């Protein structure tokens, strides 16, 4: 591992990854890989999660193609220097912010969307000019295998590497020094990643999870709400970090919600859900048994059927759920949807705020003021009103958590920013010492007074303002020179 990181660092220090042209070439190569080897990629995803190729494409591949296209179209602007506002003391100088690559970064992907959650951060790392090591999840072994086969064929092997393996390999990787680590996964492992990174003072982006609440107001179109909630909850068999984890609603709505979600599930997957090509399976037996244990002692209003041999767990709804029960103490990450009764929106807000900050928050209501009130009085990684999941698809929005649900963000320009250092640059001339004397010892009341004038008056170059302030500073310089 150490030699591999050193090899990438030497390649990065050569400057090869910095030119804009090189970055664009690598992004185009990555797009070509996705397009040319689409069938193999889809087959690998399907094998890992019992996912149809159509779902694999719409859930994962299309997102990567969109992210690459965004970077190809916007990278020249993202990578360019941005002029910075100046004060009077620096008005004749050049001040700007120059994005620069961090160096060698580590990307640790997740198994639930093994392609998009590994490749989307890589797109950002390449766009920002970094070298990168990619570590796919070992649980999605087929996707990890195809990535290990394809990436070296399309990307510069000296700058981009892939490491496969389990806990020992990840542990060894985390011992190495990186310039940034982006990890997607659960909170417990996120703490391990952060602890390892702290030994090298390596910054981290942690995309974790949590129990994402979904509040349904009584003033709501229940048909629309239940259709959208069922889609977001049961896609990928509930194994989505921003799936609605549980529903909060008034007790009078509970039976209606159960009935409407039951009808929606039938529309989505047919009478025989198990035979539907659109309904996936739990990733492995360990997660299956964990989900099985969450159902013990619960009132199952719908679903609950399971087949351990095929890791099938039907779309399930729980009613009259005790907030202190096990199913409400951990992220479910499966097709189990508890409904918790609250008296009103005030109680819902308190319920949410009494728990860890979630990765996502959903509110359904015809009343936009109520939706905005919930947003204002709670905290979460992201929010979608009157829908679920969809904020993930908007690459002009940052995607990330807060508190226990993570730190940092990516997607679109935010991916570029995450893997970049925003370097402040000030280029001064060698003239103007009469004004610069203000900062040289010995100090005096007069110097402090002039410093207040020069430093507290902000200046941004304008057409007329430029001429006026040049004259002002010239006069001030003469006065300062006479007084010092």
From Swiss-Prot:
Transmembrane annotation, as ranges: 464-484
Active site: 207, 241
Enzyme class: oxidoreductase
Main localization category: membrane
Database matches in Pfam families: Aldedh
Chain sites annotated for binding NAD(+): 185-190
Positions bearing Phosphoserine: 293
Record keywords, A-Z: Endoplasmic reticulum, Fatty acid metabolism, Lipid metabolism, Membrane, Microsome, NAD, Oxidoreductase, Phosphoprotein, Transmembrane, Transmembrane helix
Membrane topology reported for the UniProt record: Single-pass membrane protein
Cytoplasmic side: 1-463
Location of the motif Prevents secretion from ER: 481-484
GO terms (BP aspect): aldehyde metabolic process; central nervous system development; epidermis development; fatty acid metabolic process; hexadecanal metabolic process; peripheral nervous system development; phytol metabolic process
Subcellular location: Membrane; Microsome membrane; Endoplasmic reticulum membrane
Protein's UniProt keywords contain Nucleotide-binding: no
Membership in a protein family: Belongs to the aldehyde dehydrogenase family.
Official protein name in the record: Aldehyde dehydrogenase family 3 member A2
Biological source species: Mus musculus
Lineage: Eukaryota, Metazoa, Chordata, Craniata, Vertebrata
Gene that produces this protein: Aldh3a2
């Amino acid at each position: 591992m150490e030699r591999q990181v050193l090899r990438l660092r030497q390649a990065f220090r050569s400057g090869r990854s910095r030119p804009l042209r090189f970055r664009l070439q690598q992004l185009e190569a990555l797009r070509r890989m996705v397009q040319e080897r689409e069938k193999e990629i889809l087959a690998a995803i399907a094998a890992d999660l019992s996912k149809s190729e159509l779902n694999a494409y719409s859930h994962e591949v299309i997102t990567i193609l969109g992210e690459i296209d965004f970077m190809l179209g916007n990278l020249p602007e993202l990578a360019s220097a941005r002029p910075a506002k100046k004060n009077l003391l620096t008005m004749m100088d050049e001040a700007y912010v120059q994005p620069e690559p961090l160096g060698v970064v580590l990307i640790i992907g997740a198994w639930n969307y093994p392609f998009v959650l590994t490749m989307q951060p890589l797109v950002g790392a390449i766009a920002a000019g970094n070298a990168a090591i990619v570590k796919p999840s070992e649980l999605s072994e087929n996707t990890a295998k195809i990535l290990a086969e394809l990436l070296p064929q399309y990307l510069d092997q000296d700058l981009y590497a892939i490491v496969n393996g389990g806990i020992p390999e990840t542990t060894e990787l985390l011992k190495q020094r990186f310039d940034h680590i982006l990890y997607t996964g659960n909170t417990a492992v996120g703490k391990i990643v952060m602890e390892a990174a702290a030994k090298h003072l390596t910054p981290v982006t942690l995309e974790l999870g949590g129990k994402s609440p979904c509040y349904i107001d009584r003033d709501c179109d229940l048909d629309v709400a239940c259709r959208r909630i069922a889609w977001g909850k049961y896609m990928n068999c509930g194994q989505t970090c921003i799936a609605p984890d549980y529903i909060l609603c008034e007790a009078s709505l509970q039976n209606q919600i159960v009935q409407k979600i039951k009808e929606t599930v039938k529309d989505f997957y047919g009478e025989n859900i198990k035979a539907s090509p659109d309904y996936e399976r739990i990733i492995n037996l360990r997660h299956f048994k964990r989900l099985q244990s969450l159902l013990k002692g619960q009132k199952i209003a719908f679903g609950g059927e399971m087949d351990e041999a095929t890791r099938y767990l039907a779309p399930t709804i729980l009613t009259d759920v005790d907030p202190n029960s096990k199913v409400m103490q951990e992220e479910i990450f499966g097709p189990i949807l508890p409904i918790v009764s609250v008296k009103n929106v005030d109680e819902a807000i308190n319920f949410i705020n009494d728990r860890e900050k979630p990765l996502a928050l959903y509110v359904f209501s015809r009343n936009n003021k109520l939706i905005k009130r919930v947003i204002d009085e709670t905290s979460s990684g992201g929010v979608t009103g009157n829908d679920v999941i969809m904020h993930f698809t908007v690459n002009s929005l940052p995607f990330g958590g807060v508190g226990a649900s993570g730190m940092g963000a990516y997607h679109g320009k935010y991916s570029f920013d995450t893997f970049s250092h925003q370097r402040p640059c000030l280029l001064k001339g060698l003239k103007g010492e009469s004004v610069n004397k203000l900062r040289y010892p010995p100090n005096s009341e007069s110097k402090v007074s002039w410093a207040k004038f020069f430093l507290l008056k902000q200046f941004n170059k304008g057409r007329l303002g430029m001429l006026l302030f040049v004259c002002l500073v010239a006069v001030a310089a003469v006065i300062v020179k006479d007084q010092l």
